[in-house]
Amino acid sequence: MQYKYTKFMSKIKKIYICNHSHTDIGFTDYQDACFRQHGEFVEQALDLIEKTNDYPKESKYKWTVETTGPFIEYLKNAKSSQIDRFIEWYKKGRIDVAGMQYNFTPLLSMEQMIRSLYPVKILKDDYNIDITAAMQDDVNGVSWVFAELLSMIGIDFFSIAVNPIRGARVKPFPGAFIWQGPSKRNIIAWNGFHYLFGRSQVGFGNKKFTDKLLPRFLNKLENDDSYNYDFLYCESTHPIRVDNGPPDERMSNFVKSWNENNELKMEFLTVSEFGKKLNEDYKDKMQTQRGDWTDHWTDGPGSSSYETGLNRKTHELLLSYEATESILKIFEKSGWNSKKVESIYENMTLYDEHTWGAYTSIDMPESLFSKAIWNKKSWYAYNAAMETHDLLAKSSNKFAELVSDPLYDSTSASADQKVEGNFNLGDHEESVAYPDPNSNELLVINTLPFEREIVIEEPEARWGLAPVGILDTFFERGASWGGFRPHTPVRKISTKLP
């Protein structure tokens, strides 16, 4: 049967299908299970790639790994034979990897954004996988900084499939433009249909639905004078498990059958191939746009404002730890723990990832599944916070010992202080129990990129009063150990912090 709209179409010559799984860390399954599933999807995609290898070129199956986060975890546990199999089909262009670590909210700090691209370097250095494209799905935008960072590491194409539910798409839509970063680095950006478009909106995989749904979109593009492309580009996931879904064997058979019976052909391609096509055939027709692509309705972070605030504070505390350790390193006193820091950044980032709650969280908020998903999501924030406080407390104690050592600086006011201190159980005079801290020198770290006015309160002298660890950070002045502080007044100073 001839596709009934073909004879009327002068513009659209091909339908391109990018098949992938949408990465939700949570929502459909417990977070740990999601990581395992995306590794399984790689194996299933390779099975389907091999199974369709004798199909016509357009219907040979292709798969794009949407995010590097779960993929890196898969590679860590994969056998050498599994890795070799992946590399074989990657080199043949049948399976691809996009460069973003996860689908993100706007919560990431600059350091997180940079670290989120570390997997790109790991994949290139350790596996010879050279990533040239990145994609985001189900969000409304990403930080302007990514236009800069992606281009700096050799990624020249960025695709986004905006979630249209209360989400405003930039223009052109659908369409491409050159996204220029803050320092005028450029990357080609495609602002396309939602990732459910292929399976849900035009019914790919089921001819009955496609015949009914596809014509409306084709006609709209045919009659849109601002649409300057000869193709329809569709992202497509699993028809049932639209999020965290596996490859669907029916897609290759559907494309093969469609092409045998229609003049308007369909073809699988990866996100990198699509970016290359835009670069070669359409770049000279693209307009340049500058500015932040703001994701403006992230309801999730607002629904858990305490944990969101906690995680944002952890961003800054971890930078304070890094600054303190940098000073200690100069004097060969550093206890820098790169593995622990890497783990903390990963947990902070997994809280800032775009998935909030379970799919049951509205209808069944008290269910085991809803509670388990939220427990893990919030755990990312709490774990990162506690581990950061522990590192910072230990690092700060080392720094305090360093600057209070007369061998380090005998002119320091703190040089006369004793690290041991006095533990008061009510048997000391007030002047002994609450000595003057004599803190004429304070280290205050500004983790923000601009000058600000602050009020500093002199810390209480309690050397050795608490274990060297997290308790140091949360020990309050009014704690019952020794009672209130009646003897020495608390001094405060207002200053500008550069």
Task: Locate the predicted segments by residue.
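Carbohydrate-active enzymes and regulators
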Residues: M1-P498
